[in-house]
């Protein structure tokens, strides 16, 4: 029976055993660990105090016997057993899962997901085909074909969210309850260090509509402009609140402009659960709005309208796609008056004029501009083409090592988690060889953003990133640190001491545990996917861009 992504429960195992073992698993691990603590240590790939496989298996076998079952044949006897306690999946929830990341999935992908949810139900092929047909016809809406002539579909929930954005955005924009007085604007601009383009964006955000969009490429001064907006509104007695899809972007902008902040998923949960409210004098600033999906944007705009607050969307439709389904920023702009929109087109962050022009080439989404960008990068020596993915990872790590040797800040970006693992393995080997990572690896069961479980080797000296907020420890999703010590308590709890921003923070496996998958929300911090790094500014970036269509050479 499918449980979570990549995990299945064996159909036919008695329910009392499933319940008992879910409750007792940690106790059994701790018991086995205590029995063996003084006699054995893991010789490799485990932390001191973790139970050996032999002792763990024996402890579980004893528990099965105590419950009146034969541990040697329980799995075999479960095969083919009729399991009535597992109903068919909730197909509405399955449809929501299918459209969580893609608002218009291909029909064949929807069929594949439906099949995954039926694993363990002993359904013959003809029945499976009929169930697929019924679910798709009842839960999905036919959208015809995409540009590749593949059949695509969507759901009513997706259409409702997208329609809600299109309907509500102009209503909020029609209000002007938060317009600052001209004298307040002039006072704010008198002390501001900005150019004409930023002045226009500042005026659009403060002098008129209750919904404003400021769009611009990376490095065009969006954060600087918003800093002026926050300062002006706070001086006029308004409350500002910064939010974004990720904690890194939320905290980065919130602290940079001196505003209260809350990550978007948490903010929406608090607003829906009446744990938080927005005074009518609130100005909500959404950073990285281009990465916000339709459902989240529809919920946020609904809350903003009901509280009578103002919202400013900052982002770029030409950068990364939303992390969830639906082009929310594009939808919001469809029916907004031109007074609600400002654009920043001058790149200010890069040092040279040629680098600033290069930023706009990469953003253009135009083949001619892309070839110009590639040719310029080749001439500057910042473009490398190799023959294989292995060579791409080797080249990226060698370049990373050269920046490290020069004590320069550097970040590696890759497209996929598989590429990240290949890069991380190479970096960890270099750090072990140089003595920066020491001691044996401890293997912990970690979980990625989708809840997929994987073994994560960590040791003293490793750089890691936390994947969830641990409020009482001052850690957010994305906090990075260096491991100082790893230990395991007598009850089996793993404790990790980290050096984070100059302070020692101790965090436990229970604090990092994902309640859905059971894995720990922690990963290595040597490289990042492009989505996870959105909103981060660093001096040097190494991008493993993948395989290009012409010739297939990884970059």
Regions inferred by a protein language model and the residue ranges of each:
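Helicase C-terminal subdomain and adjacent C-terminal extension
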Residues: 1, 25, 43, 56, ...
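Beta->alpha loop/short-helix hinge microenvironment recognizer with preference
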Residues: 1-210, 215-220, 224, 230-235, ...
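Conserved, well-folded catalytic cores of nucleic-acid-processing
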Residues: 7, 11, 24, 113-120, ...
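Hydrophobic, well-ordered secondary-structure elements that form the walls
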Residues: 110, 165, 204-205, 287, ...
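ASCE P-loop NTPase helicase motor core
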Residues: 110, 212-373
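Conserved helicase motor core of P-loop NTPases
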Residues: 164, 200-204, 209, 222, ...
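C-terminal accessory regions
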Residues: 308, 423, 465-473, 477-555
